[in-house]
Regions:
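Helix-start (N-cap) detector for alpha-helical repeat units in TPR-like alpha-solenoids
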Residues: 14, 48-49, 82-83, 116-117
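Alpha-helical segment of the N-proximal tetratricopeptide repeat
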Residues: 15-43, 56
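Canonical positions in the second alpha-helix
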Residues: 40, 73-74, 107-108, 141
Length: 141
């Protein structure tokens, strides 16, 4: 019998746990959320949502390097995770890496063409990069 930690298989996280986590995050109980996510990660390895939430927590704490790493982990587990690409782009903007931010936002839009927030952030980032036509295209889409 295989140990669940030896597998790349994703195990579903119970909705009740997700609701509790979202409540902690929304209430700015970030350290509690981080502790809960780390505990859940032991029982539910390779769940991209947990890594995305860890990244969001560290971003909220202003710890951008670990935030970016957690978003990248979420993306490596689920390469079509538009929200993780959006969040990665947000962190890249925070640290002034506009080219990296644009790539992440663009990937989010490629995955989910109707993703309004990703289009807006991509448009603003293109404008900041003096790519005005590209920026306007995403702001007016």
């Amino acid at each position: 019998m295989k140990n669940k930690n030896d597998s790349n298989e994703q195990i579903s996280l119970p909705k009740e746990q997700v609701d509790i986590l979202m409540g902690l995050y929304s209430s700015d109980k970030i350290n509690e959320a981080i502790d809960m996510i780390k505990a859940l990660n032991d029982d539910y390895p390779n769940v991209p949502l947990l890594f995305n939430l860890l990244g969001a927590c560290y971003n909220k704490l202003g710890q951008f390097d670990p935030a970016a790493q957690f978003f990248e982990t979420a993306i490596s587990i689920k390469p079509d995770y538009a929200e993780a690409f959006l969040n990665h782009g947000i962190v890249m903007r925070e640290v002034g890496k506009l080219d990296h931010a644009a790539k992440s936002f663009k990937r989010a839009v490629e995955i989910l063409p109707s993703y309004v927030e990703a289009h807006n952030k991509l448009g603003v980032t293109f404008i900041d990069l003096n790519k005005l036509e590209d920026g306007i295209e995403h702001l007016e889409w």
